[in-house]
């Protein structure tokens, strides 16, 4: 089943795979405060906050065709590192052993997704994986009946 984990979803997948979380990462020396700004304007809260470096050859690098993209910020050994903020904060990972699409992001691509080419590529890839899984599940009974 395709998996596209966003924000806390990334954290949940990380823990499910045996990873740990640091609850107060903003208090770690050298780390940026990745929490949401306190603004009544969601365009400020969910606006682009920092760049992330994509791991060459990873799922995100292949999907987006870039090595560095700008993302918002509100806020893995069986996980494959996919993107890191310039302060070292993990921003994305994939699950290489998953039978299909399995990508976890720390940022929020759903905010104004139709206006953001990076978000659109991510959701297009997830939708394609969902369609492929649905097609395979629908085809299985037909194959069984034909045998």
Q: Could you tell me what each predicted segment is?
A:
Residues 1, 26, 30-147:
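Amide-donor transfer/coupling interface in amidating biosynthetic enzymes
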Residues 1-20:
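Catalytic nucleophile loop
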Residues 17-29:
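Short, surface-exposed, charged loop/turn segments at secondary-structure junctions
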């Amino acid at each position: 089943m395709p998996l596209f984990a966003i924000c806390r979803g990334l954290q949940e997948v990380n823990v499910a795979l045996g990873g740990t979380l640091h609850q107060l990462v903003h208090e770690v020396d050298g780390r940026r405060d990745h929490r949401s700004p306190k603004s009544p304007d969601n365009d400020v809260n969910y606006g682009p906050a920092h760049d992330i470096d994509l791991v060459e050859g990873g799922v995100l690098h292949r999907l987006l065709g870039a090595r560095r993209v700008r993302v918002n910020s509100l806020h893995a050994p069986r996980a494959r590192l996919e993107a890191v903020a310039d302060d070292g904060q993990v921003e994305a990972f994939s699950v290489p052993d998953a039978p299909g699409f399995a990508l976890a992001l720390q940022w929020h691509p759903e905010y104004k997704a139709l206006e953001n080419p990076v978000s659109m590529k991510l959701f297009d890839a997830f939708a394609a994986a969902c369609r492929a899984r649905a097609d395979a599940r629908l085809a299985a009974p037909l194959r069984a009946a034909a045998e």
